[in-house]
Amino acid sequence: MGRWQAGARERLEQAALALFLERGFGATTVPEIAARAGLTTRTFFRHFADKREVLFAGEADLPALAARLVADAPAALGPIAVIAHGLDAVAAVVGAGRIEDLRVRRAVIDADAGLRERELQKFAALADAAARAFRARGVDPLRASLAAALAVTAFRVAVARWLDEAGARGLAEVVAEVLGALQSVVADTPMPAPLPLPA
């Protein structure tokens, strides 16, 4: 009877990231990942459905998290303030301890069209979940969709900037900078009446 090896998941993740970076995602096989980690292919499949899941594991829960962050924001906050509240909460829990893994992950995804598509699908799911949560707060559908798209974009820009800086500043500080820039671009005011169309 086999026994579970301590740290197997982390070893598989590290081996996969190293191989993806060395050889490219498409040229790396599951048996190679398992061998690099000193484990069996069977052990790999106990932890991951396929090699893509090394990069995307746990992300199925992100839309629910996005919706909860919007729903849990104080009721008095407008959409831009809700975005700030949610991104501050995320920044508080994303630590710099795995920044190098996140940088490698980004490089691997950027180098593969299929992975980039998967990443875009993830962001679309986040925006959809956030838009539904904004509508549930009573935000009209157009503003809800825009707020959700802005939230996802602000998150993407902040994380990219943080990774580009190799974690020289904390993510919370970068988020604050991005939110300041966002507020300088978009005024947090009620939507004006649409202009009449020319006859």
Task: Name each model feature, range by range.
Residues 64-107:
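Hydrophobic alpha-helical connector segments
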Residues 119:
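Small/polar (Gly/Ser/Thr/Ala-rich) solvent-exposed segments
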Residues 132-135, 167-199:
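C-terminal peripheral helix-coil segments that are non-catalytic and often amphipathic
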Residues 23-25, 38, 45-57:
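HTH DNA-binding helix-turn interface
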Residues 1-23, 27-39, 65, 173:
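Basic, helix-initiating cap at the start of DNA-binding domains
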Residues 148-168, 184-191:
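Amphipathic C-terminal alpha-helical segment
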Residues 123-148:
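Hydrophobic alpha-helical bundle segments that form small-molecule/ligand-binding pockets
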